[in-house]
Amino acid sequence: MVFSTPLLLLYFQTLVLLVYYLVPLRLRNGVLMLASLFFYYWGEQGYTVIMLLSTFIDYTHGLLVRRFKSQGKDRYARLAVASSVFFNLAILFFFKYWDFLARSLRSIGLDWMPVLGISLPIGISFYTFQTMSYTIDVYRGDARAQKSIVNFGAFVTLFPQLIAGPIIKYKALDHQLEGRSHSLDRFASGVSRFVAGLAKKLLIANNLGQLWDACKQLGPGELSVVTAWLGILAFAFQIYFDFSGYSDMAIGLGRMFGFEFMENFNYPYISKSITEFWRRWHISLSTWFREYLYIPLGGNRCSRGRWLFNLLMVWCATGIWHGASWNYLLWGLYFYVLLITEKLLLGRFLERLPGWLRHLYVTVLVLISWAIFALEDFSQMGQYLAAMLGLRGLPLFNSLTGYYLRNYLPILLIAAVASTPVVITHWRKLNCPALKLAVLLLGLLACTAYVVAGTYNPFLYFRF
């Protein structure tokens, strides 16, 4: 059960909000935890046990860390943190990477590991990172050990962001779990953000996904150079509006319950360097890796060789976090090379270029990265990249190019404008509550019609 299915929109969300505001304040975290567990069980059944086990392990390890720290036994506290991290990484490896590694070994003739046919629990990459942050934050003194397993359970299972983020660090919600403010203005803001995210997903991402699906299925003889670029542009907008739409819905729904989650996107497609792009894209993941991997490894306060190694580890981890496939690792390494090239060679040169040219440079490189990301089959990836770069003697245009432009140019232009701050800037300047309400109701009506028509597609990031 996910945010843009009719059942959640019509029943679950309304029911949970109603119960939440009817019960006393002291019971609200319990309501959220039980509702979130039901939400997850509805879609995953048996895998709910894995999440409960992760919750219990990290809850108890947090208490152990606090006890050992208070007794001056720092060595034992570090062991408790290491045990927590090992457990979370172990379950993540088993469910997400075991079969990938087994198949990779078999492809080179090594039958060391059985292929188990394990399905991936939805959201495991998100909630394991959240629970790991808890024990680390407690050890560092950045957060208090949570005495209430209900409060901690609410943090881990919180259904607005359980399945696809943002990845919430425990210290960001520590005090909100025990004392958060509720107001009509905050609730209304949450509703507005939720509807905006829903519209991003259903009205923009899903429609552009149809163009990308059509383009990636074309044979080498059917593609033209422009068609290949149109397809990957559609995917770039699809993944942005799909994932940022989910984040907006999660932030909005969290706000309805009194929580304030971190922003996960900040208009990445307006960036003028690859470094800036990654400050704006999937912010919760990049900040998690910076705080819990890059800095502990030494960050940039070390020799150049060590710094390059630290960055390599971060980008390998970023790549394989997205999926158990070699193309994701290649995607991470691609950005590693781009970033170190910018930092070591291109930084001052880029600063002297006009803004539009820097933006074009980022756009081209990011679109190439999405071809690597989206196509798991290396042969298909190579053919598609060759088509984009005009290396296969393909025509610049063909009849399909005209067909796709006629049918999808309006939604591509809408997506291009909506991926910049233009819309939100004008929305904030609009001083007409009645008009704002009418726009939101119209958007909600359009989304409802889309869902009722049965044209729902799952969020892309659920598979990560």
Describe the function of each predicted region.
Residues 1-463:
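Membrane-embedded transmembrane alpha-helical bundles that form the catalytic cores
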